[in-house]
Amino acid sequence: MSENEVKDPRIDGIKTKIRVVPDFPKKGIMFQDITTLLLDPKAFKDTIDLFVERYRDMNISVVAGIEARGFIFGSPIALAIGAKFVPLRKPKKLPGQIIFEEYELEYGSDRLEMHVEAVDSGDRALVVDDLIATGGTLCAAMNLLKRVGAEVIECACVIELPELKGRERLEGKPLYVLVEYR
C-alpha cells in the first residue's frame, strides 16, 4: 500500500491477528506468525478479499505462490480472479521437467522451482508470499517467471519488514502489502 492510498479499516483487524513471536526461530528474530490470522475466518477472508479487490480487474492470468505460505494466500486469490495457480517450490518437490532459479540467503543459497509448462510466454503474473524481508525470494520468483516469458505485474505480501529493505531489491516492480511492521 502506498502512503497516498486510503487505509482500509479491515487492515487493522488483520494486523491484530498476526502474532509476533520474539526470538524465534533464533535469538534476535521477531517472527511474524500468520497461523493466528488463519485461525480467524473473518480476518483470513478479509485478507483474501483485499487482494482480490485489488487484482480482479488487472487481467492477471497466473498467480505464482511461493512455498509454503504463499500457497495459503495465492490459491484462493487465483481462484477468485479466474487465474491459474502455479506453486513455486523448494528443491526436489516437483516431479517432471522443471526450471529453477537460485538465490542467495544470509548464510548460503536456495532455489525455487516450477514446472516448465506451468507458465506461458505472455502470461500476466502476480507473485504472492506471506512476507517480504530482504526480497531475495521475490526476486528469484520474478526472475523465474520472466525467463519463461511472463510479465510480472506486481508482487503481493501480507506483511513487509521495511527495515530489511526488500522493496529496494525488486528492480522497481510494484509491491503491494497489507501490514508493515517497523
UniProtKB/Swiss-Prot annotation:
It is found in: Cytoplasm. Belongs to the purine/pyrimidine phosphoribosyltransferase family. InterPro entries: Ade_phspho_trans, Adenine_PRTase, PRibTrfase_dom, PRTase-like. Catalyzes a salvage reaction resulting in the formation of AMP, that is energically less costly than de novo synthesis. May contribute to the recycling of adenine into adenylate nucleotides and the inactivation of cytokinins by phosphoribosylation. Possesses low activity toward adenine, but can efficiently convert cytokinins from free bases (active form) to the corresponding nucleotides (inactive form). GO terms for cellular component: cytoplasm. Pathway: Purine metabolism; AMP biosynthesis via salvage pathway; AMP from adenine: step 1/1. This is Adenine phosphoribosyltransferase 4. It is an enzyme of class 2 (transferase). Its main location: cytoplasm. Disruption phenotype: No visible phenotype under normal growth conditions. The gene is APT4. GO terms for molecular function: adenine phosphoribosyltransferase activity. It comes from the Eukaryota. GO terms for biological process: adenine salvage; AMP salvage; purine ribonucleoside salvage. Its EC number is 2.4.2.7. The keyword Glycosyltransferase applies. Keywords: Cytoplasm, Glycosyltransferase, Purine salvage, Transferase. SUPFAM superfamilies: PRTase-like (SSF53271). Pfam families: Pribosyltran. It catalyses: AMP + diphosphate = 5-phospho-alpha-D-ribose 1-diphosphate + adenine. Homodimer.
